[in-house]
């Protein structure tokens, strides 16, 4: 015998009778049906739809929906049907199945001995969506419309995941059976629908975490909707939610979330709180589980707390006596300078000379000029040829100053005095007759000899041949066709000195001096008297013979 069947035995017999005084009978629900935990089954499943449990039903003590008719005792009739959850409460397409069930509703006679009635073996059978209209039409045909909702007020859509039980009672009256006002139960939700299913939480992979929060937990549960579920942590005076996204809900049966931080993040001892699932849409909650918040294990020596105290102490010290670099407007300081040792400029290097270092330059009166041009090397001075513009046709005739400067650079590397003061050639040549000499005379002596009237071949000398205007840059035809006076050309150092000595002898044109010995080549090696002078490597005639051998063959012999 079920516990619900024992209820009439504990009730007084007079409750089934109508109380004197004319009180109106009414129906009261003693045991509400359980809202969640029952599954609506289809007819095609071929099995029983089960039994609707009572609200206080447990695994050890099962209960069922129970009603009581107040202020009445006697025969009567009772009907239980399904209506929609929301008003107006019209007939629902689903139907009740079980003992004494027909056309989708339950109907039975009331026992005259008792006024409390329990409904066992009542199950809910759902219909397919394509059969909704036919099922509703069957309810209207069988007069299964407790609230007489007209067709136009009934909605075209039905909530197939929720129903209500409607209890209708008819009692005997003076004119026969009189209906009592119908009574509705609380909604019953299909356990298959995630939006209405019963929430149930299972122990996860861990039931404790740090008081700082952020620990990852895998939680198992029944079917839930990922957009309509939360993990709630709560204690007395405190509540927080676990953090997770919709993508962290795996197939509606598992949730991966991170724990929220506890209200006291510096715990010294563990604290136990509650953890549960909550559905925001209907505020439905699951049975809670225990969760323990532990002291933070990452800072066993309380280093962060000590560092905070040190930081606060330093900040207070800086506020009392700010450092120089932390002042609001520090005084400007001059830029820092770095001493770099200075080095003397490198001495200019003289180009190598062909005959060695030249003698010291001679300055008249011992005073050097203000600015002096850089002397040309001796090799370039000896090989430089001067040509007349009219003869060579390559440029203007060189000036006397340029020729004199080049000659003096070749002799001593010095620069002549523009005033025409005599040069001390006696000290240079080691001969007293040449102590003083005029610059004009020196120019004439160093210049080429005059061309004889007969032409080039009349003189018969090699020095005369060197006085020809020669320009290696011009074509040979222009050079060979024109002869005449030309600018002086530098000769080699030994031959120029030899000509100077010959002019200063008693038989020479520049005479006046004492007789001297036979002329010698001062620049070349010594040779016996009477022997012809030997050409040297530095003599210009030897170089001229090599350079002009091909050039002289182009001139016609006169």
Swiss-Prot record:
Residues 317-376, 388-544 are annotated as: Disordered. A motif (Nuclear localization signal) lies at residues 306-309. PROSITE patterns: REL_1 (PS01204), REL_2 (PS50254). Residues 524-558 are annotated as: Transcriptional activation domain 2. InterPro entries: Ig-like_fold (IPR013783), Ig_E-set (IPR014756), IPT_dom (IPR002909), IPT_NFkappaB (IPR033926), NFkB/Dor (IPR000451), p53-like_TF_DNA-bd_sf (IPR008967), RelA_RHD_N (IPR030495), RHD_CS (IPR030492). It is found in: Nucleus; Cytoplasm. Keywords: Activator, Cytoplasm, DNA-binding, Nucleus, Phosphoprotein, Transcription, Transcription regulation. Pfam families: RHD_dimer, RHD_DNA_bind. GO terms for molecular function: DNA binding; DNA-binding transcription factor activity, RNA polymerase II-specific; RNA polymerase II cis-regulatory region sequence-specific DNA binding. Residues 454-463 have a biased composition (Gly residues). Residues 342-351, 358-376, 526-535 have a biased composition (Pro residues). A motif (9aaTAD) lies at residues 542-558. GO terms for cellular component: cytoplasm; NF-kappaB p50/p65 complex; nucleus. CDD domains: IPT_NFkappaB (cd01177), RHD-n_RelA (cd07885). Spleen; lower level in brain. The modification Phosphoserine is found at residue 281. Component of the NF-kappa-B p65-p50 complex. Component of the NF-kappa-B p65-c-Rel complex. Component of the NF-kappa-B p65-p105 complex. PANTHER family: NUCLEAR FACTOR NF-KAPPA-B PROTEIN, TRANSCRIPTION FACTOR P65. This is Transcription factor p65. It comes from Gallus gallus. The gene is RELA.
């Amino acid at each position: 015998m079920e516990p619900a069947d024992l209820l009439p035995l504990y009730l007084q017999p007079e409750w089934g009778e109508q109380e004197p005084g004319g009180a109106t009978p009414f129906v009261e629900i003693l045991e509400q049906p359980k809202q969640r935990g029952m599954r609506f089954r289809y007819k095609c499943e071929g099995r029983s739809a089960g039994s609707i449990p009572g609200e206080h039903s447990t695994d050890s003590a099962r209960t069922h929906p129970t009603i009581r008719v107040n202020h009445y005792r006697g025969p009567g009739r009772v009907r239980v049907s399904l209506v929609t959850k929301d008003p107006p409460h019209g007939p629902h397409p689903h139907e009740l199945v079980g003992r004494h069930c027909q056309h989708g509703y339950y109907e039975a006679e009331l026992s005259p001995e008792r006024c409390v009635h329990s409904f066992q073996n009542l199950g809910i059978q759902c219909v397919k969506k394509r059969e909704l209209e036919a099922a509703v039409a069957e309810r209207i045909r069988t007069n299964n419309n407790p609230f007489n909702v007209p067709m136009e007020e009934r909605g075209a859509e039905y909530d197939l995941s929720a129903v209500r039980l409607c209890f209708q009672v008819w009692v005997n009256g003076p004119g026969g059976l009189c209906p009592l006002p119908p009574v509705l139960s609380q909604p019953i939700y299909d356990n298959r629908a995630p939006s209405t299913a019963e929430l149930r939480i299972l122990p996860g992979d861990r039931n404790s975490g740090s008081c700082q929060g952020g620990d990852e937990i895998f939680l198992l549960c029944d079917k839930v909707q990922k957009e309509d579920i939360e993990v709630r942590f709560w204690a007395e005076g405190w509540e927080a939610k676990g953090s997770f996204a919709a993508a962290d809900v795996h197939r509606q049966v598992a949730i991966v979330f991170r724990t929220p931080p506890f209200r006291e993040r510096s715990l010294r001892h563990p604290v136990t709180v509650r953890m549960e699932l909550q559905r925001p849409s209907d505020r439905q909650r699951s049975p809670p589980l225990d969760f323990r918040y532990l002291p933070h294990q990452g800072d066993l020596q309380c280093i962060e707390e000590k560092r905070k105290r040190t930081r606060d102490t330093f900040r207070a010290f800086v506020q009392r006596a700010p450092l120089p670099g932390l002042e609001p407007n520090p005084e400007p300081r001059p830029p820092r300078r770095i001493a770099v040792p200075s080095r003397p400029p490198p001495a200019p290097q003289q180009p190598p000379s062909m005959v060695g270092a030249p003698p010291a330059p001679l300055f008249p009166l011992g005073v050097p000029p203000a600015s002096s041009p850089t002397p040309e090397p001796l090799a370039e001075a000896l090989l430089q040829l001067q040509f007349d513009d009219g003869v060579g046709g390559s440029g203007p005739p060189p000036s006397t100053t340029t020729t004199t400067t080049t000659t003096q650079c070749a002799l001593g590397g010095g620069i002549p005095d523009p005033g025409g003061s005599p040069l001390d050639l006696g000290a240079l040549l080691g001969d007293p007759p040449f102590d003083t000499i005029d610059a004009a005379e020196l120019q004439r002596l160093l210049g080429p000899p005059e061309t004889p009237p007969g032409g080039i071949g009349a003189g018969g000398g090699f020095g005369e041949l060197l006085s020809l205007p020669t320009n290696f840059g011009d074509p040979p035809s222009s050079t060979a066709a024109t002869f005449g006076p030309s600018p002086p050309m530098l000769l080699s150092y030994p031959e120029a000195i030899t000509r100077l000595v010959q002019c200063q002898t008693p038989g020479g044109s520049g005479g006046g001096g004492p007789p001297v010995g036979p002329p010698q080549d001062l620049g070349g090696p010594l040779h016996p008297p009477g022997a012809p002078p030997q050409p040297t490597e530095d003599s210009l005639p030897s170089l001229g013979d090599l350079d002009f051998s091909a050039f002289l063959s182009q001139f016609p012999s006169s």
